[in-house]
A protein has these predicted regions:
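Leu/Val/Ala/Ile-rich N-terminal alpha-helices, chiefly Sec-type signal peptides and the beginnings
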Residues: 2-102
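Sequence-level detector for tyrosine residue identity
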Residues: 6-9, 60, 113, 139, ...
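Short, compositionally biased low-complexity segments
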Residues: 37-47, 124-130, 150-155
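A residue-identity detector for tryptophan
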Residues: 45, 55, 110, 160, ...
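Amphipathic alpha-helical interaction surfaces
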Residues: 69-79, 100-103, 107, 160-163, ...
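Charged, low-complexity interaction regions
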Residues: 77-87, 106-115, 141, 166-173, ...
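Internal, Lys/Arg-enriched amphipathic helical interaction segments that engage polyanionic partners
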Residues: 84-145
């Protein structure tokens, strides 16, 4: 079962050698979909955009995932050589983007706060650093069909792991289950494959 799942992903990776993405490109694409001017409060705007209930567990997980991705990109860029001269600029844009997902951003009209941070002037630098980042961290840019195939394979694997976990209660298996559940959440809700090395 595990071997079959791995080879299924390996086949997708081979088929997508020319089509790559990276953490910054995925985040920029998501933020592009959130940019816009709406008079509803930020929490309502985001809940509607993601198709979740406002202040639900899924809502909080989405906000956390976005902030985690912003901080992850900051950490990745800090660890790479040759980016020092641009680091302070991109960090300013990352800080501005993050403000949209703070308490203020969620509790006032999106148009008066969130939209002022999730905008072209902050997203464009993220797209530009994507090219630099992709040389170091990249993974397949999946089509909708390929994403569905990955989701199907991971669900299959989860089912198998959960059946065995009921009998054996192994803490390592539980950690794998929780990791796969988070992976599924991100790929289904945010359409993020994740970091290349996490696969």
């Amino acid at each position: 079962m595990l071997v079959a799942s791995y080879f299924s992903y390996a086949q997708i990776a081979r088929d997508n050698l020319a089509k790559k993405t990276d953490p910054a490109a995925e985040l920029a694409q998501l933020l592009d979909s959130l940019s816009g001017h709406s008079d509803v409060i930020g929490s309502q705007w985001l809940a509607t955009k993601f198709g979740v209930e406002e202040w639900s567990l899924d809502f909080y997980q989405i906000i956390f995932s976005i902030i985690q991705r912003i901080e992850g990109i900051r950490g990745m860029l800090a660890s790479l050589e040759g980016f020092e001269h641009l680091r302070s600029d991109i960090e300013g844009h990352l800080d501005a983007l993050k403000l949209a997902f703070t308490t203020t951003g969620l509790q006032v009209a999106w148009v008066s706060y969130g939209a002022n941070h999730v905008n072209r002037s902050n997203i464009q630098p993220l797209k530009m650093c994507s090219a630099f980042l992709r040389a170091h961290i990249s993974y397949p840019d999946l089509s909708i069909e390929e994403r569905d195939q990955v989701i199907y394979t991971v669900n299959d694997l989860l089912k198998w792991l959960l059946e065995h976990q009921l009998e054996e209660n192994d803490f390592i298996r539980q950690a794998i289950i929780e990791g796969l559940e988070q992976f599924l959440f991100r790929i289904e809700r945010l359409e993020w494959l994740g970091w290349g090395y996490s696969l």
